[in-house]
């Protein structure tokens, strides 16, 4: 099938799956709720009248209980941002123009000389702690220098333990989060979705080890997922997803019409689509890997470059009840599947479960998001809003 034929096949399936919602050409019909049609506060990198110089200060000044849109001008804003009020919308000048950046990694001491470290879940550059938060047209980057540490050989005295460094965390208090034309940059654990529903449209996410992970329900559309290289040769240089979806939750990470790409230096056949994360959890009878975290990742009509492993999925270690280590297997301890994958990394074999035509209607946008219609911002509306 030629490129044109494949494109028509993809568009036809998109129309079927999304009920005619032509997101590829500019978004669904106007969704319910207040549109993003005014700027309530501005953040600029230089001192200016009627503008904040800190994103956090603009959020802190927002009133409670109503949508509040904050425009962030061009520049690199070096700060951690905690969004703890419902209805906050951050609108940048473009993902190549507005960057929120900060460096923090899991093994970093919380203070000089302290034995306490931040741990993975306190490293996020931007942390969403409230529902109905939207991010448009900006970049979030955890600037911890993972590659420098990765170059050090095992056993080197300067090698760091705890290199996880999150760019964006969707916390358990969040729900109905929107990311549109957003770039997330990191290495290990770039995007952490702890809970709630998140819609990611026309965005970019870059990393290598488990760089999309967690128990949240995330729907990705027309988004580039980019694997980054490692310093030394290894069988698997990373894993795209590490879901910990609870068994009672029907949807985990769902990718519709996305692209799995790679930076220069990522070898062929080196990146599985995912592995099952069973986080260590405290129970009445001890602390061990959560047996109910049967992670779910689904790829539909996704382009896969040659770096995607032919085996498709991989196993992951966890803590057994007796404290020993055990392996969780992709075909028995997770819910992994795909449909309509294409490109050099698309393979058909018994290790890569396929969604049947009968089950395909279960993966519409409306079903995956439980009938929530996200409010999006077209490129034209963005230009008019920020001019």
Predicted features along the sequence, with ranges:
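Bacterial N-terminal signal peptides that target proteins for export
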Residues: 2-12
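Intrinsically disordered, low-complexity regions enriched for glutamine and histidine
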Residues: 4, 29-32
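Sequence-level preference for short, compositionally simple segments enriched
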Residues: 33-387
């Amino acid at each position: 099938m030629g490129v044109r034929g494949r494109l028509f096949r993809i568009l036809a399936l998109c129309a079927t799956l999304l009920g005619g919602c032509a997101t590829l050409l500019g978004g669904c019909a106007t969704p319910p709720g207040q549109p993003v049609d005014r700027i309530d506060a501005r953040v600029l990198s230089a001192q200016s009248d009627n503008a904040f110089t800190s994103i956090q200060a603009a959020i802190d000044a927002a009133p409670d209980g109503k949508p509040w849109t904050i425009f962030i001008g061009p520049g690199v804003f070096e700060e951690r941002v905690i969004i703890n009020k419902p209805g906050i919308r951050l609108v940048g000048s473009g993902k190549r123009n507005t960057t929120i950046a900060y460096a923090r990694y899991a093994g970093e001491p919380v203070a000089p000389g302290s034995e306490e470290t931040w741990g993975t879940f306190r490293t996020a550059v931007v942390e969403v702690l409230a529902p109905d938060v939207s991010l448009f047209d900006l970049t979030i980057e955890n600037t911890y220098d993972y590659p420098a540490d990765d170059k050090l050989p095992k056993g080197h005295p300067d090698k760091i333990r705890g290199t996880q460094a999150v760019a964006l965390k969707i916390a358990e208090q969040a729900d109905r989060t929107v990311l549109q034309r957003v770039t997330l940059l990191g290495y290990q654990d770039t995007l952490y979705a702890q809970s709630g529903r998140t819609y990611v449209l026309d965005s970019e996410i870059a990393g290598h080890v488990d760089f999309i992970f967690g128990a949240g329900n995330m729907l990705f559309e027309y988004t580039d997922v980019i694997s980054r290289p490692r310093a030394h040769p290894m069988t698997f240089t990373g894993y795209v997803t590490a879901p910990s979806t609870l068994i009672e939750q029907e949807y985990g990470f769902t990718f519709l019409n996305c692209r799995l790409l790679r930076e220069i230096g990522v070898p062929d056949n080196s990146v599985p689509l995912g592995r099952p994360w069973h986080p260590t959890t405290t129970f009445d009878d001890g602390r061990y890997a959560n047996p109910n975290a049967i992670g779910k990742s689904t790829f539909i009509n996704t382009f896969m470059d040659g770096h995607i492993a032919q085996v498709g999925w991989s196993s992951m270690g966890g803590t057994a009840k007796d404290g020993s280590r055990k392996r969780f297997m992709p075909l028995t301890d997770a819910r992994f599947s795909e449909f309509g994958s294409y490109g050099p990394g698309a393979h058909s074999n018994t290790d890569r479960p396929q969604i049947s035509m009968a089950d395909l209607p279960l993966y519409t946008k409306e079903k995956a998001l439980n009938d929530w219609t996200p409010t999006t911002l077209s490129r034209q509306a963005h230009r008019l809003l920020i001019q």
